[in-house]
Amino acid sequence: MMTTTTTTTTTNNSFSSAHAANATTVNKRFSAESSSPVSLYKWTDRQCLTMELWNNRMMSLIQRIINQAELVAKSKCDVGSVEFKQLKDLMNQVRAKDLNYNGSKAFEQLGYIESDMKHAPCLYTEVYRNERMNVCIFCVPNGREIPLHDHPYMCGIMKIIEGKALVEAYSHATLPPPNIVDGVPVEVIVHPPLQLTCEDQPGVFTPYERNFHRVTSVGDYTSFFDVLIPPYNKTNRQCHYFSVKNVDSSDTGVQKCSLLPSLSSDYYCDDYDLKDKPTTSRI
């Protein structure tokens, strides 16, 4: 165990060096428009959560998170920057009660029944969205998962706010990351799975490291607060789903495998709005 840990650290250092060497190339493909920090008072009707839902503390925290995410977007999502560290620190403060979020109540309102597979495998609540970011909440019922997927040329921070989640993550084995083509395997590095609760630090992924992950509810349902920079779109940042193929442990102790992408998926979430009647849409 100790030998594997030491070797993995060395490999990750090499990987980080390759990451730095290729950052300029990848950033040319990574679009995050510059903008001045947004104001909470300029939220439009398309936001799911209205200001009446927030107490004074939460208004301040949410506004700071959105403003900080704007600064991170301007820095092309440099995870080594002071701006990104400050965003992660702010995210670590968020709790379910701060968001007025209760997954159990959400499932009750939607008529979810435990172990009933006819319902969507996940709830989605949009908190804030523009062309540079998506701030949202995901809630995964007991025994369900968000399947293995990617975040093309995106970075993100996820903070567990209810329950416990098993997060299985993979990093690109080559840089710059290849384009995803249906049926063409992607070589990745396997990371040890993590179990996260609201007491843990937020999980982080970048365009290069831990960019693929699967999130599974452990025990009861789990909810997490998510910031994606920039958000998915229908042109160059579509979400792809994957299956794991050909896991291989090398002599160095580093596990690699192939992920087989599928551009089509019937996975979907139920939209859950904290104020209005929930609607259903597919993503």
Please give the residue ranges for each predicted region.
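Jelly-roll (double-stranded beta-helix
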Residues: 1-283
